[in-house]
Amino acid sequence: MSEVKKIATRESYGNALVELGKEHEDLVVLDADLAEATKTGMFKKVFPERHIDCGIAECNMIGVAAGIAATGKVPFASSFAMFAAGRAFEQVRNSVGYPKLNVKIGATHAGISVGEDGATHQCNEDIALMRTIPGMIVINPSDDVEAKAAVKAAYEHVGPVYLRFGRLAVPVINDNADYKFEIGKAITLREGTDVTIIATGLEVSESLAAAEKLAADEISAEVINMHTIKPLDEAAVVAAAAKTGKIVTVEEHSVIGGLGSAVCDVVAEKAPAKVMKIGVNDTFGESGPAVELIKKYGLDADSIYAKVKAFVK
């Protein structure tokens, strides 16, 4: 059996920007002295006149992006999630969100999988922060195919968009030939009748692997890829609640304010069901190899399998 192809979604981001740049001369890319890490350096090599390095000044970068958007161009402001969503939150809120400017934020190195950089750089709060901003679209793609499609969709959408990418190479689970991305539209990857796993980002592949293990125990798990956290596909959540009555959310993010919280909002108001949230449990991360951290914090396939099995039983 051939080995599954793995690509970090930050690589996908860089490649997608180059392809879009060839088609759209109004696309401008900004970075904050991290072009090699965020992979926007790919765009810089091809279109140096449309790449702006703002230096280690993320707040200023967001302000510059807002100004560029005000002229009618489409800026993609890029940095680590900790800096793009954390350090620059005020500027994203007041300079981009409030005036409803057409700025796209490409946030790489999100979540615990940043690895050795440690807790100060492992942003497990960005989804929570960004989804509170009125009008902000929040997208967390699961793999290379989806990430590229998400960047294209973000460009085409008029208004602020937050794109979340990872440092760790993850399995390519979507077929590029027939994949279709739609903002706010979840994708059912596996049918099931006993429990529904709603996952986002790199946790989609982990959840699919967990579902395979559950099947061996005669537990039928539906797996839904919720790539867009905002606007959330409420219809998919309501349907899952009616179908299985048990929902498990899985995210490489704090269980507070992220995908799990968004799903619970819908369940509480529209579709009563039992829900379990799997994610980072109100704690900071630590330095270590990404794969080991994912396992330690209970976000790997084996951990998901064990938690879902106990939840269903």
Residue ranges of model-derived segments:
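Thiamine diphosphate
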Residues: 1-164, 169, ...
